[in-house]
Amino acid sequence: KLPLLRLDMGRIFGSLVGASESNIRMAIKIAESISPSILWIDEIEKGLSGTKSEGDSGTSARVFGTILTWMQEKESPTFIIATANDIERLPPELLRKGRFDEIFFVDLPTSKEREQIFKIHLKKFKRDPEKYNIAEFSKKTDGFSGADIEQVVIDALFDSFNKGQELDNGNIFDAIHRTVPLASTMKEKLSEIRKWANERAVIASLPEKEISGETINISSGRQIEF
């Protein structure tokens, strides 16, 4: 087992002159000092999407340059993974082969994955998942993201508290009904991301036939219906 370090790009940038560059160098130094390790750069687009902008006096570009140079020249056994909600905002230099070994696309959770997400969040709030109709929750949350499901559970907990009762299936079903999922609010953007991923990324999991009736081709030559 290797240590996992989470680097939040949004917290790298500081208000003082030179603070951002110092922060990224310190983060790299820490990762190297405990290598072999895994460095997880969370929501990488938060820090690198503005590299061509002059609005920050070139700070983003300098941070980006530091990361690129380290990725290219590092000798320490540090395995780098990064997540992005909008990969199209990233500089093209970061996406070329050699920076990352592979780019994977993770779609909205499948039915079985949604069941697991419900269980995780119910356990987090000290509720026994076995007491709830998890399978039915999953069926009714087609198109929900993991964050949507988390908010459903939180909303249901507030609802049960306001009613002076213990959380039950009804509270959760009501919360599901009130929630507009990501697949609806970001339908066009989600379609664009899927098409981009189909041409440029490896599909991390095969989606179930759930979401819209749209059909896309994936790189293996098979067709998957959404």
Give the positions of each predicted feature.
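Walker A/P-loop NTP-binding motif of AAA+ ATPase domains
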Residues: 1-138, 156
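C-terminal engagement/docking regions of AAA+ P-loop ATPases
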Residues: 136-152, 163-226
